[in-house]
Amino acid sequence: MGKRIGLLGGTFDPVHIGHLRGALEVAESMQLDELRLVPSARPPHRDTPQVSALDRLAMVECAVAGVSPLVVDDRELKRDKPSYTIDTLEQMRAELAADDQLFLLLGWDAFCGLPTWHRWEELLQHCHILVLQRPDADSEPPDALRNLLAARSVSDPLALQGPGGHIAFVWQTPLAVSATQIRQLLASGKSVRFLVPDAVLAYIDAHGLYRAPN
């Protein structure tokens, strides 16, 4: 039986309990051997991160230290070009055994935006896609995705077979936390305790991140 590896990318600017709790729930429900959090360097579809790649990486490392099966994968930060998910999947797939399963975790909004991604039609050649369902996900997917869902979706995520090729929806506890909200609180001098892990808060405080200049 091959390994089951999950992949959750993001700017993690900063990483917060929404990312982490969702990741842990999926890792447990999907019985993953490993769930890799992959900080992105210069994501083509997102605004430029507010703090450096090294700080974002350090915060994710603080957040998952000792929390199995969550681990950090820093490969995208080592690239000197835009950070495309397809490149990461190709690289990871080449490192894994033929019977290992790779699962790409995507929030509903990111999933709906897939047709704008670089070489998006090739993603399922390398992995299964797990769409993290939220109760407020009421927007309709574009036509290209509706066709893909009709052809590739599986109702039971645990029934996904083979190294890749299918899509399933996974429930996660809704936590109305966003990195934008956390940055705004910090910039206005307010506390973000209990929105980020204590180790991340200590790092933010020690390095004066996200604070408005005096």
From Swiss-Prot:
Catalyses which reaction(s): nicotinate beta-D-ribonucleotide + ATP + H(+) = deamido-NAD(+) + diphosphate
UniProt family annotation: Belongs to the NadD family.
UniProt-listed PANTHER family: NICOTINATE-NUCLEOTIDE ADENYLYLTRANSFERASE-RELATED, PHOSPHOPANTETHEINE ADENYLYLTRANSFERASE
Pathway stated in the Swiss-Prot or TrEMBL entry: Cofactor biosynthesis; NAD(+) biosynthesis; deamido-NAD(+) from nicotinate D-ribonucleotide: step 1/1
Transmembrane domains' residue ranges: none
GO BP annotation list: NAD biosynthetic process
Molecular function GO labels: ATP binding; nicotinate-nucleotide adenylyltransferase activity
Source organism superkingdom: Bacteria
CDD domains hit by this protein: NMNAT
Enzyme Commission number(s): 2.7.7.18
Name assigned to this protein: Probable nicotinate-nucleotide adenylyltransferase
